[in-house]
């Protein structure tokens, strides 16, 4: 079984889409291993999470958005969880995906999902330092 990190972003709460997003993932038979609700995530966690983008012009705006409201951090587990949840997440131009069907903006796009095994390990350690990472790959 492979583990991956998902963040449900502030716009999902603002638009009452949290259950819809989590339901789409649940219907694909992924198991929640750990979950935390953050009424306002600490900015240092957000900055650490997005550190690879720290030199980009959008970094501060993205961090501001991520601390603008509640988020949920979730560790999901399942076969090929990283690639399958990334496909389910999609992008705003791909119908049939979470972002394609529900997102309105490139930044305020409802969900983040780890894009690789290395990212999953790193991101899970940021949001769930107490969780041991186990993968099948």
UniProtKB/Swiss-Prot annotation:
Active site positions: 112
Main enzyme class: transferase
Any Gene Ontology biological process: UTP biosynthetic process
Entry keyword set: ATP-binding, Kinase, Magnesium, Metal-binding, Nucleotide metabolism, Nucleotide-binding, Phosphoprotein, Transferase
Ranges in a coiled coil: none
Catalytic activity: a 2'-deoxyribonucleoside 5'-diphosphate + ATP = a 2'-deoxyribonucleoside 5'-triphosphate + ADP; a ribonucleoside 5'-diphosphate + ATP = a ribonucleoside 5'-triphosphate + ADP
Binding site for ATP: 9, 58, 86, 99, 109
Transmembrane intervals: none
Cofactor(s) for this UniProt protein: Mg(2+)
Gene3D superfamilies: Nucleoside diphosphate kinase-like domain
Keyword Metal-binding tagged: yes
PANTHER family per UniProt: NUCLEOSIDE DIPHOSPHATE KINASE
Function comment: Plays a role in the synthesis of nucleoside triphosphates. This activity may optimize the replication of the AT-rich (73%) viral genome in a thymidine-limited host environment.
Family recorded in the similarity comment: Belongs to the NDK family.
Entry protein name: Nucleoside diphosphate kinase
Natural source organism: Acanthamoeba polyphaga mimivirus (APMV)
Gene this chain is encoded by: NDK
